[in-house]
Amino acid sequence: MKFTCDRSALVDKLGVLARGVSTRSALPVLSGILLQANEGRLDLFATDMELSIKANLTTPVERDGEIVVPARLFSDVVRNLPDEEVVVEAGEAAVKVSAGRAAFSLNSWAAADFPQTSTFDMTGSFKVGREPFIATLNKAGRAASRDETRPILTGVLMTIMGDTLKMVATDSYRLAVKETKLDHSLETEVQAIVPVKALGEVTRLASALGPGDIEVSIGENQAVFKLSDPAGDVWIASRLIEGQFPNYKQLLPDTFDHEVTIDRGQLMATARRVSLLAQKNAPLRMAFAENRLTMKALTQDVGQAEEAIDVEFSGEPFEIGFNPGYLIEGVDAIDDAATVLRFTSPLRPGLISGPGDDFTYLIMPIRLSS
């Protein structure tokens, strides 16, 4: 294998592939990137056995072939080469990398040792605008669990029905539901539980590439996302999470006893200030009384904080407590100037939303001691 390519273009693609390289696998070849040069095109692959990434470059190929290079070292070498065309040539057990007067020889692996976990098949694909996809995940994905002991909760339930994209995530302490209208309508309903990590990589790359579409294919056990770019296309493939996603509709109350509308900026600023004293798992307390919300935090051996906000509230006073981080993340997801808070009782979940109904954030309360 031997090919020549632009250094900057190769650096960019290696940066994309790095997100799929395994850093803690017992299989050394997974710390590498597979290079396949064939008929004027270079394909690059990386996988950690759950997430796989493919990228390509159009570049002169002198000799077809394939080799697996150590991802981090190869990337560092290419990044630090002179700003000239890079020549990569594979031998039996090493790959030569050169540009200008600089030359390197790196140990490599045979391509046959690299596991191909995805064919990046786009059968039955459909397109979703990058901007609505990013906006939907940014709101819903924040509620997904990062705890691998319950794999189903590390996924996002993604549904596309008609012209609506819906994403749902929960870590059992909070629940986020976001619906977004699409420019195109799908004839059949598509639903899958996709790891939040994979969706995060898709949105990160989509944000970097700018406006356009994401082509999506949902197979029996994997999802593939393709992002087209003049500099070379990128595919991200992820396994789907098996199992039954929690029946989130049962968790959403039909009615609430209290509804309060608060200026989002004021609520965020107050919550952030007061929560500075909500340490060591201490709750952020919200005490509602006639036309007033008082936010409090108390941590033994640290101190306490309190701040009041004028609100339109009437009825029996009550106090409810929340994890401060979860509360702030919910309010932060609201785009409108006003935030709507709904409650039933101090021991029932609270609901955060904007004036519209396309985003819902349910948060479990913390039982308060007197």
Predicted regions and their residues:
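Structural preference for solvent-exposed beta-strand-turn elements
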Residues: 1-370
